[in-house]
């Protein structure tokens, strides 16, 4: 997104479709002149004005509320005009066209995706983690995710990152001062307790990484794949977890030919449950395609549930399936149809007995799913996080570890010690956008809707 930030931008800020209220938003330098053209009068900043919205010809397009926010006290840090009218698509398009026409000589143009929030970031109204939280709040699919996004938007995550950054900068400042005045012959590592300071930093960073991983799970959810031979109850389990008849269930082996995906929530965590074609040798062309897709889904899985029929002994095909499952992916072997057994099912380590039809064992299955993915319901994770945040935190941890190795030597390697501290600081700064490439900014903001 290389467009100039010195010209006004305009867009419909509400979601597509019909609604009671729709909003057209304009942001840019000195919009008071545009307001006079649109309404024939001055607008008092931060006051609601009930006015007609008219075309250049005087035709009434709509009537509603106009709000004027003067820079820097606005969402973007620039002057902002918001026109709140009725939420019909045709009405909003006409209001937007009128704004573009009235502001043509001022350079008003259509906004690009995420451009309002990008301007808020560039004008220091929010940092990059908070800007991402705007999109996360819009996309939140559960109350827990919405709360986490709001916590990030309010700056809780950024405050934790900034606190660590400040401590690293302080330590680095002391190192640089020692390097600048070598004649003082100060034993830096001892005088400033560099080693215990590094240990405390590393411990606090490890805690932050663990919390960020929880935030990633809460934001992105888990990709859970149901895999196994035909007719072991994969579709029945999907329906039981979803609480609805999502997948077709018949006693005919091979009923499921293509994947069926359903999103459910457990403790606020979104789970994308994928029912797949049964795994077996077959000459059926269509079924073979479905089986090939099953293996692709298995490769993408965060958690694999390998379903088996508790009423049937494991055979060579079961062993072949297990041998081919990726070792890196958490696995739970689920024996279905335990309600048909004469004796209680005796589960071994890594196994669970359930009845998809009767609902037995499903609560335990839900708890196991979250545990396998690393979700800790008792852990403190008040904010959402992204994979890029975790990677940045991990890079910072690696640089602190390297600094610790240098600190285990003596003051002769202080320059290397200082460099690792600088790199750790840069990694943390990339989270909040204090040290971030334009390519990353473009990637982040391009995922926003146009009105944001």
Curated annotation (Swiss-Prot):
Chain sites annotated for binding K(+): 231, 250, 252, 255
Gene Ontology CC terms: cytosol
Cofactors, names only: K(+)
Residues engaged in binding Mg(2+): 235, 256
Domain called TrmE-type G: residue spans: 221-374
Pfam families: MMR_HSR1, MnmE_helical, TrmE_N
Protein residues bound to (6S)-5-formyl-5,6,7,8-tetrahydrofolate: 25, 82, 125, 452
Known role: Exhibits a very high intrinsic GTPase hydrolysis rate. Involved in the addition of a carboxymethylaminomethyl (cmnm) group at the wobble position (U34) of certain tRNAs, forming tRNA-cmnm(5)s(2)U34.
Subcellular location: Cytoplasm
Organism, as annotated: Bordetella petrii (strain ATCC BAA-461 / DSM 12804 / CCUG 43448)
EC nos: 3.6.-.-
Listed GO MF terms: GTP binding; GTPase activity; metal ion binding
Gene Ontology biological process terms in this record: tRNA methylation; tRNA wobble uridine modification
Protein name: tRNA modification GTPase MnmE
